[in-house]
Swiss-Prot record:
Positions where Phosphoserine occurs in the chain: S71, S86, S359, S646, S656
Designated name of the protein: Cell cycle checkpoint protein RAD17
Consequence of changing T633A: Impaired phosphorylation by ATM and interaction with NBN
Role summary: Essential for sustained cell growth, maintenance of chromosomal stability, and ATR-dependent checkpoint activation upon DNA damage. Has a weak ATPase activity required for binding to chromatin. Participates in the recruitment of the 9-1-1 (RAD1-RAD9-HUS1) complex and RHNO1 onto chromatin, and in CHEK1 activation. Involved in homologous recombination by mediating recruitment of the MRN complex to DNA damage sites. May also serve as a sensor of DNA replication progression.
InterPro entries: Checkpoint_prot_Rad17_Rad24, P-loop_NTPase, Rad17/Rad24_fun/met
Complex and partners: Part of a DNA-binding complex containing RFC2, RFC3, RFC4 and RFC5. Interacts with RAD1 and RAD9 within the 9-1-1 (RAD1-RAD9-HUS1) complex. Interacts with RAD9B, POLE, SNU13 and MCM7. DNA damage promotes interaction with ATR or ATM and disrupts interaction with the 9-1-1 (RAD1-RAD9-HUS1) complex. Interacts (when phosphorylated) with NBN; promoting recruitment of the MRN complex to DNA damage sites.
UniProt-reported outcome of changing S656D: Abolishes interaction with RAD1
PANTHER family xref list: CELL CYCLE CHECKPOINT PROTEIN RAD17
Predominant location category: nucleus
GO cellular component annotations of the record: nucleolus; nucleoplasm; nucleus; Rad17 RFC-like complex; site of double-strand break
Amino acid sequence: MSKTFLRPKVSSTKVTDWVDPSFDDFLECSGVSTITATSLGVNNSSHRRKNGPSTLESSRFPARKRGNLSSLEQIYGLENSKEYLSENEPWVDKYKPETQHELAVHKKKIEEVETWLKAQVLERQPKQGGSILLITGPPGCGKTTTLKILSKEHGIQVQEWINPVLPDFQKDDFKGMFNTESSFHMFPYQSQIAVFKEFLLRATKYNKLQMLGDDLRTDKKIILVEDLPNQFYRDSHTLHEVLRKYVRIGRCPLIFIISDSLSGDNNQRLLFPKEIQEECSISNISFNPVAPTIMMKFLNRIVTIEANKNGGKITVPDKTSLELLCQGCSGDIRSAINSLQFSSSKGENNLRPRKKGMSLKSDAVLSKSKRRKKPDRVFENQEVQAIGGKDVSLFLFRALGKILYCKRASLTELDSPRLPSHLSEYERDTLLVEPEEVVEMSHMPGDLFNLYLHQNYIDFFMEIDDIVRASEFLSFADILSGDWNTRSLLREYSTSIATRGVMHSNKARGYAHCQGGGSSFRPLHKPQWFLINKKYRENCLAAKALFPDFCLPALCLQTQLLPYLALLTIPMRNQAQISFIQDIGRLPLKRHFGRLKMEALTDREHGMIDPDSGDEAQLNGGHSAEESLGEPTQATVPETWSLPLSQNSASELPASQPQPFSAQGDMEENIIIEDYESDGT
């Protein structure tokens, strides 16, 4: 039997693997041939997935004896390779969920996805258009696994889009293109967008091809897109056109899965803005990070099974180490499983073998009796945390809450020395968090974090003197970051002064036993500075457009010239100029000004630029996002204008400014000249 006979049994890695493991180099270092390892991995995974029970139970099955091996297996040494693969198989694949009960996802989220699948797939109307679902959430929270398990249980086919790999451009192909003796041959190329459109058309029109082991007794199917073509991130309008067309001609549901990112790249807002979601009726289901309690149960189950099977070959972590792993993975269960396997697979010299027949509970008692000193124990926990290796991130809502609520730990006289009596008013308990670390984990620039802090700090104070002191710290922090020449150097110092100053100024929260009148929830809001700064930039553009004859900067034009023009009785025929002067040059006669409308800050906000709320100029030096990218801004130009050159410059007016409504009849009116009568006549 030749090796080619085994090749049709090898399926795609995308289908068999739950996730690309981080331990592929284990198999590369082995002496097993490629065809042997591949065929074994596919056969074992397919048998465990389809015909066997759950993963945790199937891992207890013993291997076959040597006498039952075929001649082909003995030739290629499959006995040793099976033992090697069973010992070094990535745990993220070995313990992947197979049923709903094994999912580390909240039951309400599973029911929400299942309800959508039943309504859009199982109860779908014949002439119903294409429905679209957007699933978001942090990496490793079970988005794709939940969808595939529910689809498998309900008998729904999943046709998944995978970005095609372009063929390599060989040197001979390059020579053949420019060979004068032969005909000109272009290198065959097709854009990913064209391939993606063709895939959607074929997937919604034809059924899935029946592969080895597939069950196609049902015609219910969904299209899954998790890895979008890269061109859509540059030109999102092309994706929007594809979505609009699919809603009209689609025959099966289309599901997109996008992972959240706290590093500043908000792909959901770029690819699926609010307008497109409302226009195409896109449903949105957001997953939360895996809860520490659920993750702890999942890791304990893996540790128990591995300890019973390979107790002498792995290092069994204790409860403290597992809790440290759960804290360091930030709700990513894949990262936690990989870290658990990596931390347990240490060298033979560091292994602590157990005696035969010793249970895991007795081994834990033995480890407690032989526990080392505290500094060594702390170093071991730090080693496990370093193995986890994932940066801990905070949403903006939680980061602001840690600063504004400023929880503290009570100290005794033995813990730290007290301040002298003349400095007793500055005495505070130790903070539970480091403000600099909180800002760093929020993945936000320091000056932007100060804006959110300035907007919300007043509601957390009880004394006016404390508010005055906190405002002084914020003012000093703004001075440090005000100069653009030194902003990059002093930004971290400015944020440190602002955060620590606000926390220190709040005397009502200066001690652990008094938390500012209780720890009741207070809503947070986005800074009003965004709306005010947007209005200021629009007024500058309008002033330059309406008064081009005055060669003055926008600031001087609005503070020195326009207020005086509002007091003069110079007639003007341009209604836009009149409205603008009345808006800028005259203040309303109000004793009490109402607060601007505030936009609430949700618990999943990233604090990044939001074009719908006027945040696009927050960090671009007063320019909009389009101007910073070099894109021209569009303006509303009325078609009925026929003004002189001195007044016909409103083509750059923003849409929020009043536009002139003069018609052709108004332009033919005579100019009214008012005579000045002196007191002596």
